[in-house]
Amino acid sequence: MTRKEVVLAVTAATITAVAAGVLMGRWIRRKERRLKHTQRILRKFARECATPVSKLWAVADALVADMTASLTAECCGSLNMLVSFTGSLPSGDEKGVHYGVNLRGKELLLLRGTLGGNEEPISDVQKHEIPIPDDVLNGSFKELCDFISLELVKFLAMNPGGEAEEVKNLGFTLTRSVEQIGSHSISSIHRKSLANDDDEKVLKDLVNDMNESLETHGLKIRMNTALVDNTIGELAGGRYYHKDTVAAVSLGMGTNAAYIEQAQEISRWKSAIREPQEIVVSTEWGDFRSCHLPITEFDASLDAESLNPGHRIFEKMVSGRYLGEIVRRVLLKMSEESALFGDTLPPKLTIPYILWSPDMAAMHQDISEERETVNKKLKEVFGIMDSTLAAREVVVEVCDVVAERAARLAGAGIVGMIKKLGRLEKKMSIVIVEGGLYDHYRVFRNYLHSSVWEMLGDELSDHVVIEHSHGGSAAGALFLAACGDGHQDSESK
């Protein structure tokens, strides 16, 4: 090779190296710019979701105001609370075998359990989950009653023993995921507030339909309590174990809270309530809305595109049905504006409600160095096969912001209920919490507990005890069955 050729080769190599260096520098700078933009989106989102103690108290006070308004006026505030005439709650002395039914969306859960009295734990709990056929879902309530009765016959045949000659009580609860199922659907019946005689008659007719069906199928089981939200069943379970149980909260796919109110505080339904009497109230707090709620652009777009825009605002911020969707929307914006997952937008990231709260919880609670669970879930859920560690860290941070806000708002709701009862400084108050978010999402649960402690401080926080539900999912129906005296009985006395 001649001297000239050598010079040309060296020059070409130098130019190539310089060009490669320039391109590499541009790539690095572009990557840094994208990461900075991602961080800006994250910081803005976290700032808008922030729930300092002052914000939590503002939310709690607004909830108290709406609860008070709902008890005194027909249309005032964001809540339309429901009074549940479940009769006397358990005392802890109840004994024997009891039966329960829990209607949860398109599924039916049948239960049987034994209470030993003396506040002994429920035992021998047997459960059987059954899908409800579409024709039954879209049929009349009588058709649903016949389906339930037939399945109860099978359930007892599969689980023999414990039957007696006397008629047993049946508790019937509805989980928040219940959907509209026909013109006489459970979901529409559940929202009856017993505000007038027609509504009361509807509920009595439902109980009668169920009992007629049970008798027709030869079952020595009768429904003596009204159809109630599952949260009220959990409250009954809490009362069985401790007389200081005053409220119950459901934090699963949906959310609700129920508490025990004094009859003299309820003027809206005064003609239907005899005093003195403790009344169980379903707050329907999923409908709660307030200017103090930390609503972001992602919450606003989720609500606008939902099937019920403008409604269930609190539920859309705290329940398992929506938390994963909020995370998805944030990640989508990051992917569109800062190429979080590369230059090509992952198609599945654009699919609404593809990310469920269990997957979100798994990513959030991943403590491995390489965020291996996050990597696995990104592949499984979104089809993102090649994510960087930095991107996976961002995913965890987004999950943390969403979960922390939800849990702390739920904690503020709990404090608000206790404040409404005037028990913050005076008495021990036990609140039962049930649902997948609380039961299986450890970080969410910790955030909820810490928010209550932060709001109340060392001294007052000792007065509020938060406990898991008793007997497992939907066991509240069994405790309602143990109550014995239901709405029908109380009306006939």
From Swiss-Prot:
Its EC number is 2.7.1.1. ADP binds at residues 105, 436. It is a single-pass membrane protein. GO terms for biological process: DNA damage response; glycolytic process; hexose metabolic process; intracellular glucose homeostasis; response to cold; response to heat; response to osmotic stress; response to oxidative stress. The chain crosses the membrane at residues 5-25. It catalyses: a D-hexose + ATP = a D-hexose 6-phosphate + ADP + H(+); D-fructose + ATP = D-fructose 6-phosphate + ADP + H(+); D-glucose + ATP = D-glucose 6-phosphate + ADP + H(+). Residues 91-228 are annotated as: Hexokinase small subdomain. GO terms for molecular function: ATP binding; D-glucose binding; hexokinase activity. D-glucose binds at residues 193, 256, 284, 315. It is found in: Membrane. InterPro entries: ATPase_NBD, Hexokinase, Hexokinase_C, Hexokinase_N. Residues 36-482 form the Hexokinase domain. Residues 229-471 are annotated as: Hexokinase large subdomain. One of its GO terms (cellular component) is membrane. PROSITE patterns: HEXOKINASE_2. Pathway: Carbohydrate metabolism; hexose metabolism; Carbohydrate degradation; glycolysis; D-glyceraldehyde 3-phosphate and glycerone phosphate from D-glucose: step 1/4. Fructose and glucose phosphorylating enzyme. This is Probable hexokinase-like 2 protein.
